[in-house]
Amino acid sequence: MYIAMNRFRVLLDRRQDFEQMWLSRESRLPEVPGFVEFHMLKGPEREDHQLYSSHTVWRTYEDFVAWTKSDAFRSAHARAGNNNTPTMMAGPSEFEGFHVIQEVKSDGSKKVIAAE
């Protein structure tokens, strides 16, 4: 399993616009092989920005890489600079990718996953 995250520092007076942009966008992720789930997270408020993070779970790292080379990726990111997105941000977004090495479920089951 692979988790891809992007951190966004959103200007305080643009939080509503940022949230609406994400909540109203059409996602093609469910059509992409290897996609598991997506979450948009709202984090702590800082002095000059609100922290948000997108959290996408992929079956494998290879599935994530294939998505980054797909039409679905290009389509989703072609609009990334539209809707005044840069004026919403307190700086560029920051990508973070993680290989899952352990999984613990609510039923108590635990799985160790070989690091890739």
State what each model feature region is:
Residues 2, 39-48, 78-116:
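Glycine-rich beta-strand-turn "strand-cap" elements at beta-sheet edges
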Residues 10-18:
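Short, surface-exposed ligand-recognition loops at beta-strand->loop->(often short) alpha-helix junctions
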Residues 14, 60, 70, 105-107:
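Serine/threonine-rich low-complexity intrinsically disordered regions
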Residues 14-15, 26-27, 31, 42-45:
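Intrinsically disordered, low-complexity segments enriched in polar/charged residues with Gly/Pro
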Residues 9, 41, 55-57:
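Short hydrophobic/aromatic beta-strand micro-patches
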